[in-house]
Amino acid sequence: MLLTVTSAHLFPSQVVIHFKPGRNTCSECHESLNVQKTRPGKRAATLAIGDFIAHETVYYCPRCGRVFHSDELRALIPENSNFGYDIIVFIGKSLFLRCRNYQEIRLELQLKNVRISESEIAFLAKKFVLYLGLLHRLVRRKTKKYMHMNGGYILHLDGTCDGGSPHLISVLDGITEIVLDNRKLPSENAEDLIPFLQSIKKSYGVPLAVVSDMGKGIALAVKEVFKNVSAFICHYHFLKAVGKNLFGDENDILRERLRKHNVRVILKRTKSRLEKAMADTTGLVHAMIAGIECEKLPAECPLSAVPTVAVYTLISWVLDSGSEGNGFGFPFDQSYLVFYQRLQEASLRLRQLFRIQLQGNWKENKVYSTISHDLHSVINDVGLRKAALRMEEKVAVFNRLRKAMRITLPETGRGLNDNGDPSVTIKTIEKEVGKFRAWLSKSRGYAEHKEYRKLAKQIDTYQEKLFADPIVVETAAGRILVQPQRTNNILEQFFRKLMRTYRKKNGFNSMERVLKTMLPDTPLTMNLKNQEYMQILLAGKKTLEGRFAEIDSKVVRRGLEQSRSGTSTMYPPLKKIIRIPGLPKSIVSLLEQTAS
C-alpha cells in the first residue's frame, strides 16, 4: 500500500515548515547571534514534499554584521526561488532525456503535489541548462585529464541553424562522446570560428584529429588553429554534398513544375469528393483490400462502386509517396521524384482500368476519365518528364556510391542514425570507392554530364580526408590504435532530437525563433547519458541536485539576465509594417502630411 503513496497524500494541502540557521554563534567572531527577521509565507515546492509554506528565521551577528540563513533551506531551494533543485533536475531530464513537453511535465508534477505553470517550467528548463553549463566549466580540467588518459581526444565539429537564426556550433570528443563546448555564432565563416576553436584548444589541448563537414570556413579555421592536425570529413556530409551537386537542379525542376500544376491540391480535392461519394456505402475500402489480398473481389461488393474505390485507392497511394523514404532527407530520399513516379504509374493504371467494363457500361468508368483529364497537363509535361529521367539516372549513380561507402543504406533501417557498418574496415571502403571512381570515369554519362566529372573531382580532392588511417596514441595502459568515427552523427542525432522536442512543444516546423532564444549550452544535456562524464560532474555527490546546490544562485541569475539581454524583441504590430516596400519614405510622407 505504501508504494502508491505520493507527496500529494502525505501532507495537508498547505503544510508549513520552519527553517533556521544551524548555528547560534558567528563563524568569524564567535559572538552569539540575534534574530534579524522571520520570512513568513514563502511558497515553496520540492519533489519529496510537494507544495509547502517555508517560514525562515534569519540570524545576524551584532558585532560584525554577518547574516546567517538556513543551510537546510538553501540545500533544498535556490535563493529567491520557489522550486527546489530536485524539481529543476526533474524538468531538465524530462525535457531533454524523456522528450516530454511542458504540458506533460506539468501534469506529472501535479501528481507529485507540485503546482506549476508551463511558463515556470520553461524558465526552470533554462535554469537547468545554466546550472549544467556552470558545472561543466568547473570540471573542465578533470574532463581534460580523463580524455588524455584515453590517449587524447578527436574533435567533432558541427552546427545547426534555421532561416535567420544564429549558428549553434557544438564540439565533442569522438572517443568518449563528451560534448566539450558550444557557441552561438553569426556564421560558419573562419573569422567567427577561429576564436571559438582557440578557446577549445586552450581548455582541452590539441586534438588527435578533427572531423567536420565540408564547409570552407570550417576548413580554414581548423587549419589556422590546429596546425599539422589531421582533418577528416564526415562521410554523411560528403554524400549529402555530392547528392545535392549531382541532381539538385533536377530536383528543383520537379518541385517547381509539380507546384505549378497544383497536382497535390487536385488529388486531395478529388480524394475528398470520392470520400463523400463512398460515405453511404460501408466497407467498400475493406472489400477492395480483401480483393487485392485474395486476388478476387468479395461477392457482396457492389460492382458499380468499384471504380470509385479503385481511383480513391490510387490517389491515396500517390499522396503516400513520402512513406517510400527512409528518413534520410534529400538527397538520400527523393520525395519529388518518387511522387512523380507514382503519378506516372497511377496514370498508366487509370488508362488500363478505363478499358475494363465490370457491368458492360462505359458510363461506370467516367471516374477514370475525369481524374485522367485533371492530370493530363502534368502527365504530358515534357520538361518534367525529361528532368525525372535525368534524375533517375543520376540517383542510380549516387546509390552506387552510397553502397561503396557503406552508409545511409535503406536496408539498414537506421535512417539518419546510421554511423556506417562497423564490421567493414576503412581500407575496404576506400578500395570500393576507388572502384566506383574508376567505373564512373568509364561510364557513358561521364563525358555527357559535367556533374559526373565534378563528382570524380570531389572524390579525388577529399580522398585523404575521407579515409583516415588509425591514429597511434600513447595511454597509461600502453600504445593503442584509435580509429576516427566516420560521421558526425552523434551531434546530428542530438540536433534532430532537440528540434523534434521543440517542434512537438511548439507545434510549428520553423526553428528560427527557438534557436535565437535557446541557450548555447543546451547540447551539454547530451552528456547526461554518459556515465563516465557524470561521475566527473558529480564530484562525489550522489545527485545532480546536490551539485546544483553548490552553485552560487547569484551567478545563475546573472546568466539568465545575460540570456534575456541577448534576445532582441519587437513590438508585434511592427513586424507587419517593416516589410512594406519604401517604408522610410512612407514614414516621412506620413509625418509631412500630418504636419501640413
Give short role names for the model-derived ranges.
Residues 2-14, 38-49:
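Short Cys/His-rich Zn2+-coordinating modules
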Residues 12-23, 49-55:
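Short, flexible, mixed-charge glycine/proline-rich loop motifs
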Residues 23, 212, 219, 264-596:
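Acidic/histidine-rich catalytic cores and adjacent linkers
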Residues 26-29, 61:
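Short cysteine-rich clusters marking metal-coordination/redox-active sites
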Residues 33-96, 150:
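Basic, short loop/linker segments at the boundary and entry of helix-turn-helix/winged-helix-like folds
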Residues 35-39, 111-211, 216-229, 245-252, ...:
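RNase H-like nuclease fold core
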Residues 61, 91, 105, 155-160, ...:
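Short, conserved catalytic/metal-binding motifs centered on acidic residues
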Residues 97-109:
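Short, charged amphipathic recognition helices of the HTH superfamily
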